[in-house]
Curated annotation (Swiss-Prot):
Family statement: Belongs to the SPAN-X family.
Record-annotated disulphide pairs: none
Pfam family, one: SPAN-X
Ranges where the record places region Disordered: 1-49
Cross-referenced InterPro entries: SPAN-X_fam
Location(s) in or outside the cell: Cytoplasm; Nucleus
Main localization, broad class: cytoplasm
Cellular component aspect of the GO annotation: cytoplasm; nucleus
GO BP term, pick one: spermatogenesis
Name of this protein: Sperm protein associated with the nucleus on the X chromosome A
Length: 97
């Protein structure tokens, strides 16, 4: 039989026991041996939920200089104190179930 190298670089004259041709592989189970429980339903709130989202509209930068100038401006001014027309506000009310 030809010599085979092992991971350590030592030449072997016989294959490893795990490389035998007639070795059987153990079969894996096809079904879940530990099934997960179904997810629980979320508790419903007794009061309605109001979601408010604010984002800037018409906000566009065209050059790196404008990016730097606008970044400095944003650091000086509190976003809550900016002019209202710069922001769009969306309000969604989710009724109680």
């Amino acid at each position: 039989m030809d010599k085979q190298s092992s991971a350590g670089g030592v030449k072997r004259s016989v294959p490893c026991d795990s490389n035998e041709a007639n070795e059987m592989m153990p079969e894996t189970p096809t079904g879940d041996s530990d099934p997960q429980p179904a997810p629980k339903k979320m508790k419903t709130s007794e009061s309605s939920t109001i979601l408010v989202v604010r984002y800037r509209r018409n906000f566009k930068r065209t050059s790196p200089e404008e990016l730097l100038n606008d970044h400095a401006r944003e650091n000086r001014i509190n976003p809550l104190q900016m002019e209202e027309e710069e922001f769009m506000e969306i309000m969604v009310e989710i009724p109680a179930k």
